[in-house]
Regions:
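N-terminal secretory signal peptides and thylakoid transit peptides that target proteins
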Residues: 1-15
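N-terminal cap/lid segment of alpha/beta-hydrolase-fold proteins
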Residues: 49-95
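Short amphipathic alpha-helix adjacent to the substrate-entry channel of hydrolases
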Residues: 116-133
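Alpha/beta-hydrolase active-site loop
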Residues: 144-163
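Primarily recognizes the serine-hydrolase "nucleophile elbow" in alpha/beta-hydrolase
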Residues: 160-220
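The feature captures the conserved acid-bearing segment of alpha/beta-hydrolase catalytic domains
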Residues: 205, 231-264
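Mobile cap/lid helix-loop segments that gate and shape the active-site cleft of serine hydrolases
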Residues: 211-242
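C-terminal catalytic histidine-bearing segment of alpha/beta-hydrolase fold enzymes
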Residues: 267, 276-314
Length: 314
C-alpha cells in the first residue's frame, strides 16, 4: 500500500507517469486514444490533482474528521472474512433495533485509504436513526480489482446475514461509495447476489459519488499501469455493461469542478440508470471538486444527505 503523501504527490493514480512508453506518447502526441482525448489529455482526465489543487488538504481531512467522529461515537468492529484486513466498523445508535443500514465503500484510486478514513458520514446516519458501516478491504498493489470486488461483495453479504447482531434490518441494506469506491458501489448495485449466495434483493438502494461506470477509458489512461484487466474483465467490472442486473434505485452525484471525463462518466451512468427506471436522483454538487463531494454526507442538512436519507425512507 502506498502512503497518502506519495499518492497525492504523484497524482492519485498517476504513479507510473514517468514510464509510459507503452502508450507511445512521442510517436503521435495528437492521436486520439479515446473519444476526442489524446493520451496526455486522457491521462490528465484521470489524474485528479490536475483538477483539485487542494487534494492533499481534503484527503488529510478525511482522516482527521474520522478520528474526531470515532472519539465521540466509537464503532464496533467486526470481521467479515479470515484476513486481518477484512473487517468493518459499525456505528449504531444506543439500543439499535431493526434499523436501516448504510454501508460505505471508500475511494482512493483503488490504491489507498481505508475504513479508518471513512467515519465522517456516521453522525448523519446515526443521528437519523440508521446504522452506518465503513468496510475495509485490501488496496492495490497488494490486491487486484477482482479481489476488491470479491471482498466488497463478501462484506455486504456478511452485513445482510448478520444485521440483527448489531440492531440492523437485513431487509433494509443500502450501499454508497466515492471515487473508486463509487465504481465499486456501482459494481455492487449490478451484482447478481443470488449467484453469490445472498438474497437477490440484498440491496435496497445505493449512492454513487464521483464514480466510474465504464472501465475502458480507465485502462487506456495512466491508471492502466496498475489497473490491469483482460478485455473480458473490463466488461465484467464495468457497471455500464451490467445494468441488466440492477434491481434497486440509486442516486448519482458528482462535483461541478470535476474533470469533464468524470462528469461524463457519472452523467452517462445516471442516464443509463434512468433508462432502466433505476435512477433515484442526480446531484451536481456546486463548487465541489472530486475529493470534496463525499464530504456532503458529513452534513445532515446537505441536499445529498437529505436525498440519501429519503432513499432509505428515514
Amino acid at each position: 500500500m502506498i502512503d497518502r503523501r506519495q499518492f497525492v504527490r504523484y497524482g492519485l493514480g498517476a504513479m507510473a507517469a514517468t514510464s509510459l512508453s507503452r502508450f507511445a506518447h512521442a510517436d503521435d502526441e495528437d492521436k486520439k486514444v479515446f473519444l476526442d482525448y489524446t493520451q496526455k489529455q486522457l491521462d490528465d482526465a484521470y489524474t485528479q490533482t490536475v483538477w483539485a489543487p487542494n487534494a492533499k488538504q481534503v484527503i488529510d481531512g478525511y482522516a482527521r474528521t474520522s478520528e474526531e467522529v470515532r472519539q465521540k461515537l466509537p464503532p464496533t468492529t467486526y470481521s467479515y472474512g479470515s484476513k486481518a484486513s477484512e473487517n468493518l466498523d459499525v456505528f449504531a445508535p444506543p439500543g439499535a433495533r431493526n434499523l436501516p443500514i448504510m454501508v460505505f465503500i471508500h475511494g482512493g484510486a483503488w490504491q489507498m485509504l481505508s475504513k479508518d478514513d471513512s467515519s465522517g458520514p456516521a453522525p448523519t446516519f446515526v443521528g437519523a436513526g440508521a446504522i452506518y458501516i465503513a468496510i475495509n478491504f485490501d488496496n492495490m498493489p497488494g490486491n487486484t480489482l477482482p479481489g476488491m470486488v470479491d471482498q466488497c461483495r463478501r462484506a455486504l453479504a456478511w452485513v445482510g446475514a448478520n444485521a440483527r447482531r448489531f440492531g440492523g434490518d437485513p431487509e433494509r441494506v443500502y450501499v454508497s461509495g466515492h471515487s473508486s469506491g463509487g465504481h465499486l458501489t456501482a459494481v455492487m448495485l449490478t451484482t447478481d447476489w443470488k449467484a453469490h449466495g445472498a438474497p437477490a434483493q440484498l440491496l435496497k438502494g445505493g449512492v454513487v459519488m464521483s464514480g466510474m461506470g465504464d472501465l475502458a477509458p480507465v485502462v487506456l489512461s495512466v491508471r492502466g499501469k496498475y489497473v490491469t484487466l483482460s478485455p473480458a474483465q473490463v466488461i465484467e467490472f464495468s457497471p455500464m455493461k451490467q445494468l441488466d442486473k440492477a434491481n434497486c434505485p440509486a442516486l448519482v452525484a458528482w462535483g461541478t469542478l470535476e474533470s469533464p471525463e468524470f462528469k461524463r462518466q457519472n452523467r452517462e451512468l445516471a442516464d443509463a440508470l434512468a433508462g432502466r427506471a433505476r435512477l433515484a436522483g442526480v446531484f451536481r454538487v456546486r463548487g465541489a471538486n472530486h475529493f470534496e463531494v463525499v464530504n456532503e454526507l458529513n452534513r445532515p442538512d446537505s441536499e445529498l444527505s437529505r436525498a440519501t436519507l429519503a432513499l432509505m425512507n428515514i
